[in-house]
Amino acid sequence: MKRPDLSVEIAGIKLRNPVMTASGTFGYGEEFAAYVNLEKIGAIITKGLSLKPKAGNPTPRIQETTGGMLNAIGLQNVGIDAFIEKKVPFLRTVNTPAIVNFFGNTVEEYAELAERLDKIPEVAGMEINISCPNVKHGGIVFGTEPKAAYSVVKAVREATIKPVIVKLSPNVTDIVEMAWACADAEADALSLINTLTGMAIDLKSRRPILANVTGGLSGPAVKPVALRMVWQVAKAVKIPVIGIGGIMSGTDALEFMLAGATAVQVGTANFLDPAASERIAAEMEQYLVNNGITDVKELIGALQV
């Protein structure tokens, strides 16, 4: 039997396999190049970018939890100018699509970032992090209010011809309503879930462990929530969905595809095993071989309910 076809396509971006790296867990790609063959994964999604460099939150900002981790890094990044000057040259050398995750404090900032990224040939597409407060409108998080999400996505859509993926926050009452708002604003694809908001407490000091008090929960603990949300959203929209949340193995990744995801992102697993994304892609291929499946696309949305 010839090797199964693991290739998928997201909004015109051709991936050799469905495994992408999740933003914030893989640096800008170069940091992991010594541990992972970057040409054995589907795409690299870079650490979230902002217009200006960002120092992030004070420490402590990471805490291990049962079945996962809490992070309050605070979107620390080099800023768009340093990204173009120092990070893009490496991406030019890699034969794997690079998708740039970015965020802003206002609709205008999102649009400006999209406009600048649009001009960089090495950027195959963009992933918008809408889990940020809108500083012009009382700090409401863009990703928790459909109209706010629509306005950001629409502004980005008008600023670029490159594929636009929107990363959805799970900290909402109705994830489908948010998905519809982004699809209506002409997003090309949706990725979900971002982290769930959580906290950890030190009983001895009676204080929060994280300096920021709350942080984002990720890892295996969130996988059942992520699977459910991916399943709901994939049924509700016509654009591709990318599954994120606690993916540690090829089995986990394939479950997300059955739920309706076209591709997946590996995040927290990268901290435990720097080669996780490559290993997960290999495990997916082995499953297809073992089960006589010739094309991974046969599994997308094949959940029998």
Curated annotation (Swiss-Prot):
GTP-binding in keyword set: no
Cofactor: FMN
Keywords (A to Z) from UniProt: Cytoplasm, Flavoprotein, FMN, NAD, Oxidoreductase, Pyrimidine biosynthesis
Pfam families cross-referenced by the UniProt entry: DHO_dh
Active site: 132
UniProt GO MF annotations: dihydroorotate dehydrogenase (NAD+) activity
Any one GO BP annotation for this protein: 'de novo' UMP biosynthetic process
Cofactor annotation remark: Binds 1 FMN per subunit.
Gene Ontology CC: cytoplasm
Catalytic activity: (S)-dihydroorotate + NAD(+) = orotate + NADH + H(+)
Residues noted as binding substrate in the record, renumbered to the chain: 47, 71-75, 129, 194-195
PROSITE patterns per the UniProt record, alphabetical: DHODEHASE_1, DHODEHASE_2
Subcellular location: Cytoplasm
Pathway recorded for this protein: Pyrimidine metabolism; UMP biosynthesis via de novo pathway; orotate from (S)-dihydroorotate (NAD(+) route): step 1/1
Enzyme Commission designation: 1.3.1.14
Gene3D superfamilies the record matches: Aldolase class I
Residues reported to bind FMN: 23, 47-48, 101, 129, 167, 193, 219, 245-246, 267-268
Task of the protein: Catalyzes the conversion of dihydroorotate to orotate with NAD(+) as electron acceptor.
Assembly behavior: Heterotetramer of 2 PyrK and 2 PyrD type B subunits.
Family: Belongs to the dihydroorotate dehydrogenase family. Type 1 subfamily.
UniProt cross-references to PANTHER family, sorted A to Z: DIHYDROOROTATE DEHYDROGENASE (FUMARATE), DIHYDROOROTATE DEHYDROGENASE (QUINONE), MITOCHONDRIAL-RELATED
UniProt name for this protein: Dihydroorotate dehydrogenase B (NAD(+)), catalytic subunit
Chain's gene name: pyrD
